[in-house]
Swiss-Prot record:
Pfam families xref list: TPP_enzyme_C, TPP_enzyme_M, TPP_enzyme_N
UniProt similarity note: Belongs to the TPP enzyme family.
Name the UniProt record assigns to this protein: Pyruvate decarboxylase
Organism: Kluyveromyces lactis (strain ATCC 8585 / CBS 2359 / DSM 70799 / NBRC 1267 / NRRL Y-1140 / WM37)
Keywords noted in UniProt: Decarboxylase, Lyase, Magnesium, Metal-binding, Thiamine pyrophosphate
Residues reported in the UniProt entry to bind thiamine diphosphate: 390, 413-415, 445-446, 471-476
Domain of life of the organism encoding this protein: Eukaryota
Residues where pyruvate binds: 28, 115, 477
Catalytic reaction annotation: a 2-oxocarboxylate + H(+) = an aldehyde + CO2; pyruvate + H(+) = acetaldehyde + CO2
Gene Ontology CC annotations of this record: cytosol; nucleus
Cross-referenced InterPro entries: DHS-like_NAD/FAD-binding_dom, PDC/IPDC-like, THDP-binding, Thiamin_PyroP_enz_cen_dom, Thiamin_PyroP_enz_TPP-bd_dom, TPP-bd_CS, TPP_enzyme_TPP-bd, TPP_PDC_IPDC
Cofactor(s) required, per the database record: Mg(2+); thiamine diphosphate
Subunit record text: Homotetramer.
Enzyme class: lyase
Length: 563
């Protein structure tokens, strides 16, 4: 095999970086490209219900596998995906967006083709995507196409941001040398500048030597930019108390003896708030300081000794060191930190949240009880996905087993995101370990935006747990504004009929309304193994919400009302 098509080259390269499932929809400008998927052993085409869901699925897949790929068609297809792509950009998720575009000659002649705006401008959609992409490429020359594909894949993986790649329909079946595949794409980070890195390390070590009450705070980009192992070792070597933010949940093992809880500014538990805010040194790893991640910007550190490790810079107090990447900086710090921290005397960390008190089995379910009890159901290795709304806030009260991966969209907050993300995560989990459980918590309102993707789960025999929190509408919106407003109401669905409606044959659908029903279901041994797709409708009062969401809603309403 001396020559292969450009389309096959793309998919062979994706397989080399462990992308095995491709998301998207067929369209006449990408059909020839899609033919090439089936030429690559081990590669599969998911085939989504719509492009928005496909983008959400690509996001969920990338969070577990490191990057993903979605394929859409020019204009109508690619624009339908952009909300999801924007979310991946905001949340630091590497998604390669491949768009099948009209032929080079059609573009040059400015033909009045379908899926265009009718003005001869074939670059307008590319320009739109450029604002939410780390880089873009529009292939026009077969000779440079392989190098451009390699550049786009590398950038997607290394930057953990979306990348746009336009492939004209007339080029995908042209051939390129197969020998190009023999040289792997370089996915390594560029080393830090040695002098800048050394200055950072020396300054951080000095702050550690002087600290009496330091803490470590892990945030979203600790996971996104692959610094979890370094952060864990930092905790082990120093024994500093360690905390996570809502977006960082799952980036530190919560059974670690030095794990102290979730810090959300003023929304934190009193013990966590005191422990973090009284620190005389904060080592922050991968911070993403958005409103819902910080309790509406209510961080209140008493110290100015704050070190921020980021994917592309490090900040020490008020001094910024551009280009000093956290992964390498942490690795260098780990070689010296034990000696610097030898004078530290460990202080107690806030204790693990207490278990629920025993109540009568007939007790109606409430949010506070459910989220504590969820921790009893989870086990090591689970992927836990929480929708924007009560789920994203309630999960902060759940104590994770070790090696649990949390997926949420706290910054972008597009409701309905998690249905597609669950599909993508389920594909990824199946490739990593078929026994790995994928567990979704989503509200009844959010589900109505993206429910079609459950049919894709069924078509592929995927087996996630779908916990649908039925609180009769948009509770998070009611808490912020319009408690009884008609616009926060939805049509109630017969949720237990969804799986058979979408064609499921081997499934379980059950409704739980009381603590006894919840406990009986979640402690059943057969239920605990992911042998089939399951939908669990959880009945909850309309205005019931986790306590931290009630507080956040008040803060958000106040912010919205400010002049």
């Amino acid at each position: 095999m001396s020559e292969i098509t450009l389309g096959r080259y793309l998919f062979e390269r994706l397989k080399q970086v462990e992308v095995q499932t491709i998301f998207g929809l067929p369209g006449d400008f990408n059909l020839s490209l899609l033919d090439n998927i089936y030429e690559v052993p081990g590669m599969r085409w998911a085939g989504n219900a719509n492009e928005l869901n496909a983008a959400y699925a690509a996001d969920g897949y990338a969070r577990l596998k490191g990057m993903s790929c979605i394929i859409t068609t020019f204009g109508v297809g690619e624009l339908s995906a952009l909300n999801g792509i924007a979310g991946s950009y905001a949340e630091h998720v590497g998604v390669l967006h491949v768009v099948g575009v009209p032929s080079v000659s059609s573009q040059a002649k400015q033909l009045l083709l379908h899926h265009t705006l009718g003005n001869g401008d074939f670059t307008v959609f590319h320009r739109m995507s450029s604002n939410i992409s780390e880089t873009t490429a529009m292939i026009t020359d077969i000779n440079t196409a392989p190098a451009e594909i390699d550049r786009c894949i590398r950038t997607t993986y290394v930057s953990q941001r979306p990348v746009y790649l336009g492939l004209p329909a007339n080029l995908v079946d042209l051939t390129v040398p197969a020998s190009l595949l023999d040289t792997p794409i370089d996915l390594s980070l560029k080393p830090n500048d040695p002098e800048a890195e050394e200055e950072v390390i020396e300054n951080v070590l000095q702050l550690i030597k002087e600290a009496k009450n330091p803490v470590i705070l892990a945030d979203a980009c600790c996971s996104r930019h692959d610094a979890k192992a370094e952060t864990k070792k930092l905790i082990d070597l120093t024994q500093f108390p360690a905390f996570v933010t809502p977006m960082g949940k799952g980036s530190i093992d919560e059974k670690h003896p030095r794990f102290g809880g979730v810090y959300v500014g003023t929304l934190s538990s009193p013990a966590v708030k005191e422990a973090v805010e009284s620190a005389d040194l904060v080592l922050s790893v991968g911070a993403l300081l958005s409103d819902f991640n910080t309790g509406s910007f209510s961080y209140s550190y008493k110290t100015k000794n704050i070190v921020e490790f980021h994917s592309d810079y490090t900040k020490i107090r008020s001094a910024t060191f551009p280009g000093v990447q956290m992964k390498f900086a942490l690795q260098k710090l780990l070689t010296k930190v034990a000696d610097a921290a030898k004078g530290y005397k460990p202080v107690p960390v806030p204790s693990e949240p207490e278990h629920n008190e025993a109540v009568a089995d007939s007790t109606p379910l409430k949010q506070e009880w459910v989220w504590t009890q969820v921790g009893e159901f989870l086990r090591e290795g689970d992927v836990v996905i929480t929708e924007t709304g009560t789920s994203a806030f309630g999960i902060n009260q759940t104590h994770f087993p070790n090696n649990t991966y949390g997926i949420s969209q706290v910054l972008w907050g597009s409701i309905g995101f998690t249905t597609g993300a669950t599909l993508g995560a389920a594909f990824a989990a199946e490739e990593i370990d078929p026994k790995k459980r994928v567990i979704l918590f989503i509200g009844d309102g959010s589900l109505q935006l993206t429910v079609q993707e459950i049919s894709t789960m069924i078509r592929w025999g995927l087996k996630p747990y779908l916990f649908v929190l039925n609180n009769d509408g948009y509770t998070i919106e009611r808490l912020i504004h319009g408690e009884t407003a008609q616009y926060n109401c939805i049509q109630n669905w017969q949720h237990l009929e969804l799986l058979p409606t979408f064609g499921a044959k081997d499934y379980e659908a059950v409704r739980v309304s009381t603590t006894g029903e919840w406990n009986k279901l979640t402690t059943d041994e057969k239920f605990q193994d992911n042998t089939r797709i399951r939908l669990i409708e959880v009945m909850l009062p309309t205005m019931d919400a986790p306590s931290n969401l009630v507080k956040q809603a008040q803060l958000t309403a106040a912010t919205n009302a400010k002049n």
